Amino acid sequence: MVPEQNDLTESSVWLQLENLAREEGSLHLSDFFVQELGRCAHFCLESDGLLVDLSKQRVSSHARDLLVSLADERGLDRWSEALFAGAEVNCTENRSAKHWLLRDPSDQAAEIHGQLEIMDSIVSRVLEGQWRGVLGDAITDVVNVGVGGSELGPLMAAFALHSTPLAEGEVRPSLHFASSMDGSQISQVLQELNPRTTLVLVSSKSFTTVDTLHNANTARSWMARALGLEMDNEAMLRCHFIGISAQPDKMTAWGIPSTNQLQFWDWVGGRYSLWSAIGLPIALTVGMHGFRELLAGAHDMDLHFRQRPWHENIPVMLALVDVWNINFLDIRARAVLPYDGRLKYLPAYLEQLEMESNGKSVSRNGDPVDYHTCPVIWGEVGPNAQHAFFQLLHQGTQPVACEFLMTARRYTESAHSGAAVELEGQHALSNANCLAQSRLLAFGEQALDSTLALPAYKRYRGNQPSTTLVLDELSPRTLGSLLAMYEHKVFAQAVIWGINPFDQWGVEMGKVIATDMLAVLADPDGAHEVDDSSLSLARHIACKQATQ
């Protein structure tokens, strides 16, 4: 059973937080540092390989204590117990959310470990050159065909961990990703590949996703024509296609033999699926040892979330500070700013994880909420962001909370020895910029410690709150811990807001309407019950296509 919750905005702690926000809302971040000596020590949290500095958030010690009380009042401890007990915390689909079980090393996950062993066999054969194409060639390229969680997580993690050393004798293939339904990505990827040495991963929880199946069909047709084979050739499908899904019957119907099928379960949400067989592209990048380290890091954070008191609990404190910003300071946007180029795809991954989970306006009880929930999440690699939208952060009119990510150690591998000094200098430059931007956003021109009077157009007001996360180094284990941290943060926020973070009904109706719009595009002059704007656009497209 899941705990019941009362009306959030009528709680006594919520009302106290509203009063405190009115009292402290006009304070500048610099005031907090003056009023609370040793503030950084009180607002820094650590876990294995990760430090989180919340001191540049516009939250006082009093506000923090009240927020912790809010977590207690909302029953976060009972909700956490329900999550890890396998209760049906996904109330609209009557499902549990046991993605945490995918990284549990205990015997209760025997079925999961069985799939990991199948993954291990596939990964070893590919990396050691033993997986052969239908004409006997070793695999050099792997194409991941998937969309949403079947791409965002694997793409992000594989890119981040690409420099992870492999075992002796292992050679990682080149990875490619195709998700767009218009065919542009799959077309560009395939025209650069040799079908004799290409392996295609078809990743779809339902194995009915239109985007994925159209791309998979295109890849199968390309492979068959290039090799002079029929599209249902069993040897071609056995040597060049692997399916990953919760629906084995549908994989079989498409043509993927059972020996090439990896499975996961309906209680694994797409945005939580990189820990499952959906993470095969990650394993092909770091090897199975590296993939197991990724799982171990996530399990470390699971234990941290379950065992640490709230005021020492990284996911919970991140969630509570976000709630403070959104609901009490009216800051409804957050920029994710990694100052390590390997985390290039982390902002896009978090956009899905957070906005698809908590972008809800209806409570678990089915009532409209009367408070804000998930903020708009966006971001870019820090140095690029400085030349793109930092102008708005520093001198614009929108309050934005920022999240900086950096690594303490980099370029220690022997592979970089030829340019170690230069690369270490670049790493220091990146970290210096990260620290400088967080200081400037917090304190404005006061950070310059200068008495010069500046004209208005050169002024920096500061007072933009930020969190800084420092990884000891970027490794499979620390990345696993970081990603699980964000998952638990999202869950904790959902508990505070009383919403279901494990469904995504907001993406479903558009798929139905798209089917209707296909008929409109095919015959825009026919009789259709559709709005004038959409009909006019369909006719415009038809007109342009008729003249090409």
Swiss-Prot record:
EC identifiers of the protein: 5.3.1.9
Residues forming the catalytic site: 356 (proton donor), 387, 511
Matching InterPro entries: G6P_Isomerase, G6P_Isomerase_C, Phosphoglucose_isomerase_CS, SIS_dom_sf, SIS_PGI_1, SIS_PGI_2
Subcellular location: Cytoplasm
Gene Ontology biological process terms, A to Z: gluconeogenesis; glucose 6-phosphate metabolic process; glycolytic process
Gene Ontology cellular component annotations, sorted alphabetically: cytosol
Catalysis performed (reactions): alpha-D-glucose 6-phosphate = beta-D-fructose 6-phosphate
GO MF, one annotated term: carbohydrate derivative binding
SUPFAM superfamilies, A to Z: SIS domain
Pfam families: PGI (PF00342)
Keywords attached to this entry: Cytoplasm, Gluconeogenesis, Glycolysis, Isomerase
Flavoprotein listed as a keyword: no
Superkingdom of source: Bacteria
Pathway assignment: Carbohydrate biosynthesis; gluconeogenesis; Carbohydrate degradation; glycolysis; D-glyceraldehyde 3-phosphate and glycerone phosphate from D-glucose: step 2/4
Similarity-based family: Belongs to the GPI family.
Family matches, as HAMAP family: G6P_isomerase (MF_00473)
Function: Catalyzes the reversible isomerization of glucose-6-phosphate to fructose-6-phosphate.
Protein name per Swiss-Prot or TrEMBL: Glucose-6-phosphate isomerase
